[in-house]
Every structure is written in C-alpha cells, then in structure tokens.
C-alpha cells in the first residue's frame, strides 16, 4: 500500500446559517452554528484515509479544543496525527462561514497555527518525506514551506501532488518544477492560466 504524507492546513469550520448576508453595520440573528473539521490539508488526509490509504498528516495546530476536533475526525478514518505540531501561542486555524437561504456563502479564514509552519519544521521531520510514497500539498500554509517540502520530496524521488488553492497572486514557477500532478478546479485553472477555461480539453 502506498504511503501518503499530507503537509498542509487544519481548520475548524464554524458554519452559520443566516437569512441573508449582512451588510456593513447590520446585525442579524443566525439560525444555528455547526463546528465542522476542515482545512484543505485535513480534507485531503480525511478523504485518502476514508479510501483506505495509509496516511500521515503533518501541520500545526493550537493547544485548544479545536485541535481535538481535527484529531478525532482524522483518527476516525485511520490517519496518523502523532506528528502534528502544537503551537501554544496560536489557535488552531478557523474558518467562519456564513451560508444564506439560497446556499451562497461568505468565508473568513483565520490562519492561526497554519501560518507558523516553516521550512525548518519540514527539515526537522524529513524522515516523514523519506518514508512516504506520495506527498499531497495545498497553499493554505506559507508558500515558502510548500516549495521547500515539494523540492525535498522530489529529491527523495517521491510523487508530489498539489491542490493549488488558494491561488497566490504570483504563482512561483519554481514550484511547477517539483509537481507531478496539479489538480485545480475551473476557477483556479483560469487564475493559473490567466484566461477563462471553458472545457476540459483546454
């Protein structure tokens, strides 16, 4: 069985149902709030674990109850979370998601501990890169950290897969040279190409 290492973000999504999106200065009453494990990195790890893969999640969380929500969710599908870094001075990443009656949403992301993951953290845990077969990355952690992780993974002969979200204003050409598979959605593909994408063949 292939070993998958996910290096990336862990967020807890606070999903709030609202009758309509508030405008500046407006106070509205929400229906309810639900705490949902999320973060693009954790979502990748959860999906791979649910499919039966051998998965390790590497990232940074806070020393709080939100990190417990993430760990419990990932553990439920067999993902190894023993290498997560705990930042006592930061909260676990959070996302405030308002959803109106038509299903439209607005999202505010608080990076929290995700923003603290560094190249030095990756270097200190290179045994995880050496031991995996596939590296999965996204861009909700510092870009320099992603580039370093992808570069080292390629040097170790690993397959590197990138979910290029959120797409940075200037996508570093260097990162392309370390990627084997890139999986943007339609909007992200258009941002990367600098032009609309209207069909799969394009």
Enumerate the predicted regions with their spans.
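Conserved phosphate/ATP/ADP-binding segment of small-molecule kinases
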Residues: 150, 154-202
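Active-site-proximal loop->helix
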Residues: 65-77, 95-103, 125
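Conserved phosphate-binding/catalytic loop of the ribokinase/pfkB sugar-kinase fold
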Residues: 82-87, 97-134, 139
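Structural detector of well-ordered beta-strand residues that form the stable sheet scaffold
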Residues: 5, 56, 136, 161-163, ...
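Residues that scaffold the ATP/ADP-binding catalytic core of kinase and kinase-like folds
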Residues: 15, 108, 191-195
């Amino acid at each position: 069985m292939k070993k998958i290492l996910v290096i990336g973000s862990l967020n807890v999504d606070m999903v709030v149902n609202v009758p309509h999106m508030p405008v500046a200065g407006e106070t509205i009453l929400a229906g309810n709030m639900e705490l949902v494990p999320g973060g693009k990195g954790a979502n990748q790890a959860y999906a791979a674990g649910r499919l039966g893969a051998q998965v390790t999640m590497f990232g940074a969380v806070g020393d709080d109850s939100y990190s417990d929500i993430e760990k419990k969710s990932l553990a439920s599908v067999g993902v190894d979370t023993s290498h997560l870094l705990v930042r006592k001075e930061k909260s676990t990443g959070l996302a405030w998601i308002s959803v109106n009656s038509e299903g439209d949403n607005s999202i505010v992301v608080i990076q929290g501990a995700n923003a603290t993951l560094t190249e030095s953290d990756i270097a200190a845990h290179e045994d995880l890169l050496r031991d995996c077969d596939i590296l999965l990355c996204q861009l909700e952690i510092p870009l320099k950290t992603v580039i370093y992780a992808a570069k080292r993974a390629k040097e170790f002969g690993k397959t590197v897969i990138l979910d290029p979200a959120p797409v940075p204003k200037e996508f570093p050409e260097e990162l392309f040279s370390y990627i084997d598979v890139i999986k943007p959605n339609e909007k992200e593909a258009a941002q990367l190409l600098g032009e609309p994408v209207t069909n799969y063949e394009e």
